[in-house]
C-alpha cells in the first residue's frame, strides 16, 4: 500500500514538474526568444477607411495610430437601429470616449445601463466593463476617441478575417495578447494569466496575433468603401 502511494506521489510530482516546465519553457520561447513580430505600418487603417460589422456597427477612421504618433485614435462610430457591439468587454489600459452626434447610445457600463443622447458624451475609463447598443429607431452616430489607441485600427481587420468568430485559443492570442481587449468575465487578472500561459500553445498549433492576409483583404474592402488607396501604399 505504501509503495503504491509513493508511486502515485512520484507520478503526480513528475506530471506537475512537466506542466511547469512546459508552460515555463513555452513562455520563454514565445515572449523572449522568438517573440511575434509587430504588425507593419501598412496594416493600420488610413483616415477615411470605413467598415461594418455583422452586428450593425459602422466605423470610419478619422485619425489613426500613425496620424497621432500613438497618442490616440479618433473614429466615426455608428450603430444601426437594433445593433450592438458583439460582447461586453474591458480595455485594461485604454480610455474610450463617445460623443453622440445624433440618435441615442445605450451602453452597459459596469453594472449600470446608461443612455447617452445627442450632444452628450460617455467616458469609459480603463478597466471598465462596457457594451454599447442602439435600442432606438434611428441610427446612432458618434465620434469615438480611444486613448492610447493601441492597435485598434488593425484589430477589426483581424477579427473580420476570422468571420468575427474567433476560437478560445485565438481569443487568447488576438484579443488579449495583441489588442488589449478582454472579455468582461472572468476578471482581467484571470484572463491575462490564462492568455500568458496559453499563448505559446496557441502559437504552437498555428494561431497568431496578426495575419497579414487578413489585413490586406480587410483594407482592400475598406478602401473600396471609402475610395481610399491600396493598403500597402505609403502615407
What are these model-predicted stretches?
Residues 2-72, 83-88, 94, 106-235:
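Jelly-roll (double-stranded beta-helix
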Residues 101-102:
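A cytosolic small-molecule/anion-sensing beta-strand core signal
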Amino acid at each position: 500500500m505504501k509503495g503504491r502511494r509513493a508511486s502515485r506521489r512520484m507520478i503526480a510530482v513528475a506530471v506537475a514538474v512537466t506542466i511547469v516546465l512546459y508552460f515555463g519553457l513555452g513562455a520563454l520561447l514565445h515572449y523572449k526568444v522568438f517573440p511575434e513580430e509587430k504588425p507593419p505600418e501598412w496594416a493600420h487603417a488610413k483616415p477615411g477607411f470605413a467598415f461594418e460589422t455583422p452586428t450593425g456597427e459602422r466605423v470610419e477612421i478619422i485619425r489613426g495610430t500613425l496620424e497621432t504618433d500613438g497618442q490616440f485614435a479618433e473614429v466615426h462610430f455608428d450603430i444601426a437601429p437594433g445593433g450592438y457591439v458583439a460582447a461586453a468587454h474591458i480595455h485594461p489600459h485604454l480610455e474610450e470616449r463617445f460623443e453622440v452626434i445624433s440618435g441615442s447610445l445605450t451602453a452597459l457600463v459596469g453594472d449600470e445601463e446608461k443612455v447617452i443622447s445627442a450632444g452628450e458624451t460617455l467616458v469609459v475609463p480603463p478597466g471598465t466593463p462596457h457594451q454599447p447598443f442602439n435600442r432606438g429607431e434611428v441610427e446612432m452616430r458618434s465620434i469615438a476617441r480611444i486613448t492610447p489607441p493601441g492597435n485598434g485600427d488593425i484589430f477589426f481587420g483581424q477579427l473580420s478575417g476570422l468571420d468575427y468568430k474567433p476560437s478560445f485559443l485565438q481569443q487568447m492570442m488576438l484579443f488579449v495578447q495583441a489588442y488589449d481587449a478582454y472579455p468582461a468575465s472572468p476578471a482581467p487578472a484571470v484572463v491575462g494569466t490564462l492568455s500568458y500561459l496559453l499563448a505559446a500553445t496557441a502559437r504552437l498549433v498555428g494561431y497568431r496575433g496578426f495575419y497579414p492576409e487578413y489585413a490586406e483583404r480587410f483594407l482592400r474592402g475598406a478602401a473600396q468603401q471609402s475610395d481610399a488607396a491600396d493598403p500597402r501604399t505609403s502615407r
